[in-house]
Amino acid sequence: MSRIRSALALVALGLSAVAGHAQTSPAISTIVAFSLSNPVGNLVQGADGALYGVGRPATSIPGAVIYRAALDGSDVRTLYQLKPDDALSPAGGLVLASDGLLYGTTKFGQAGQIDSAGSIFKIAAAGTGFQIIHRFAPVTASNQDLNPINTNGAYPEAELVEGADGYLYGVARAGGPNGTGTIFKISRDGTDFKLLHSFAAVTSSTTSGLTVTVDGAAPTGPLVASTDNFFYGTTSQGGANGRGVVFRIAFDGTGFQVLHEFSA
């Protein structure tokens, strides 16, 4: 298959089971390909059955889009193109909340703000009502690994998840008082933002330059809500070996615990 430069391909996977619990190789078909640099995050299926996602330019310039695509590729449309005064670089996929709106994050804030740390937005599936509901606090300093420090988190790169209480929960890769990332919750209207956990300060670095902390650093994947009333997640760095950890935290923000530290 020829490589499509600066394009997004939505694929359909056909899986066929055979006797003996074996499976044939997935049949992969491109249902639509269109010019869009750096599609990011997961797709989410809306109430109308269509797929919704985000994409951003190759650089941190305005032009990122929120788009909709029919399952068969017959209807692909841009719902909204982010403006310089909105935010830059959508970093995770969208989540469809119980209010029927789509929510997402951006890695940076408004164009031209060098201390920006990202934002959270919402938009209707019809492409109307785009709104920034939260801007993360400005960056005020950096830690020993040159990661940004602020009060509540910076560079959210993972999809949000909605809790049973209707709040949205997420992680920020950096920021917080130690620059190693945070776990947060926010009401859908953006009026109530709470910091649930700030990852610990950097204690040292490994010989290969990995960040060592007591409880993880740089969470980049989404949280998973479990039936035991805990969120589970991972960090890409930190822990005793600097290779990241698996953690959990209760829905109310208590009981943070490292479950596993990945080995060196």
What residue spans do the PLM features occupy?
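Extracellular beta-propeller repeat domains
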Residues: 2-264
